[in-house]
Amino acid sequence: MSALGTLNSVVRDEIFALNLAFNSDDHPQKVNLSVGAYRSDSGKPWPLPAVQEAEKQLFAEANAFRHEYTTIAGDAGFLEAARDLMFGFDNLQNAAGTAAKLRISSVQTVAGTGANHLGALFLSKYLKPQTVWLSDPTWANHYTIWDLVKVPYKMYPYYSASDGSFDFHGMMSTLESDAQPGDIILLQACAHNPTGLDPSPQQWKDIANLCDRKHLFPFIDAAYQGFATGCTNNDNWIVRYFLNKKPHIDMCVAQSFSKNLGLYGQRVGAFHYVLNEDGKGLRDTVTDHLCQLIRGEYTMGPVAGSDIVKRVLTNPVLRAQWFENMRSMSFRIVAMRKALFDELTRLKTPGSWKHITEMIGMFSYIGLSPTQVEVLKTKYHIYLLQSSRASMSGLNSTNVIYVARAIDETQAFPDLSWRPLPPRSGHPIYHGLEPGQVILPKGTVRFASWRSLPVDTEFNRDVPVVLRDGVTIYLDVFRPTETARSSPPYTSEANMERRGQAAYSSTPLRRIGLTFLNRTLKI
């Protein structure tokens, strides 16, 4: 027997599994809305013209040192250009900008995932936080990254499934009441993945003030600078606000060039740790500790991709061309949102679809049930995540009407039935969940629970429960199988009622004791 004979199976990454299934599908009308990569109106990858020109220039120079080692921290020219782009120093050539630069430790990473991981590893080792707060929902890889560094996470409300809006009140009230000094709060700078919903400038100010008042550590994931509005300076607004208006607190930023330069496979990113004004003398020490972690993992970031980024950012002609390329991508996605909304409206598809045009960036939560998503895949060959997150760049002028009609026709499919879930090892549903209590924020979607179930779990969808005040809510009930009876049952508020209409109480539902649910549902 192998030494790994007792190794538990794990659930494969949903996005990559869907992409593999899409590539194996030979249906002529198949549509891929799962992968977070930009596609042109012809449905093909679009190498940015600015990137192609940069590659031509680099190749023509035939630099014999192009493939040599740089430094553990990374290429100095790339890091300076990346830092200036992220923190807006291009427009701040004065004494204040010079002073702010001295507070920032920057290192090159293996794209945005590597920046998130390095930051999580560094903070877990030296700040030793008790909790990291993640938005509900968030990018799925955030859970894995923080699990690997053994920092428990809790969720703050972010998305209201009842109307497809940003749940600012739920976020603020939860963090105000439950977050503790020293906790990390993970924020996405723009084009929130997966919801496509961003705070307004005033809401960002309120969030920053809460971090200041509660002594929370902001960790900003900036994977889509330029994708939200087509303007890099607009999309890094919260980063610049923290830097300039909250100089007395530390923060960090994970930066990626995968999306905004289309360098998905080149893995180009940076991690920036921003010291407060009193700690700026520690910058080199912070860099040394980051380099120690880098040396033990990947030694240095890839050179080929960072050379391209450096050339684009430092060449005025290419930089201007790149800005135009980003605007083209951003505006096409906006046009596809409107086209999908217009067709659903024309078809008189039940429900409100205005959230599709109100969301920004690459992704949208369409608002379909898992059963409807499955129907889209099996009957119409349209691939999107079970949460109904869709990459809007997968839409184009030749398939948007087909997708809209398919969505319209899936409204006839209810979301019922028993079915087993695949075994999954690892963490419980919510780290820090107290026994006998389940948190049910208004608007919680079903996907928030199935993604992190214990091993050997079954679930029943859309179980109606009449509360003491007479309000009926629809719950997904999760309970262990006979082989795992030691695990307690969990519930999650369903996002769709049986006929496809939202079923929520008129007042925000915050907590329900499991003892009440046990008695009602006879679990």
UniProtKB/Swiss-Prot annotation:
The protein's name: L-tyrosine:2-oxoglutarate aminotransferase ucdG
Protein's cellular compartments: Cytoplasm
Gene that produces this protein: ucdG
One GO MF term: L-tyrosine-2-oxoglutarate transaminase activity
Pathway entry: Secondary metabolite biosynthesis
Subunit-level organization: Homodimer.
NCBIfam families listed in its UniProt record: PRK09257.1
Known catalytic reactions: L-tyrosine + 2-oxoglutarate = 3-(4-hydroxyphenyl)pyruvate + L-glutamate
Key word Transmembrane helix present: no
Record bears the keyword Manganese: no
Entry cofactors: pyridoxal 5'-phosphate
Its biological purpose: Nonribosomal peptide synthetase that mediates the biosynthesis of usterphenyllins and uscandidusins, p-terphenyl derivatives. Within the pathway, ucdG is probably involved in the conversion of L-tyrosine into 4-hydroxyphenylpyruvate (HPPA) as a precursor for the usterphenyllin and uscandidusin biosynthesis. The pathway begin with the biosynthesis of 4-hydroxyphenylpyruvate (HPPA) from L-tyrosine, possibly by the aminotransferase ucdG.
Pfam family, one: Aminotran_1_2
InterPro entries registered for this protein in UniProt: Aminotransferase_I/II_large, Asp_trans, NHTrfase_class1_PyrdxlP-BS, PyrdxlP-dep_Trfase, PyrdxlP-dep_Trfase_major, PyrdxlP-dep_Trfase_small
Known EC number: 2.6.1.5
Family membership noted in the UniProt record: Belongs to the class-I pyridoxal-phosphate-dependent aminotransferase family.
Keywords, ordered alphabetically: Aminotransferase, Cytoplasm, Pyridoxal phosphate, Transferase
Deleted gene: phenotype: Lieds to a slightly decreased formation of usterphenyllins and uscandidusins in Aspergillus nidulans.
A GO cellular-component term linked to this record: cytosol
Enzyme class: transferase
Entry-linked PANTHER family: ASPARTATE AMINOTRANSFERASE
GO biological process terms on file: aspartate biosynthetic process
Source organism, top-level taxon: Eukaryota
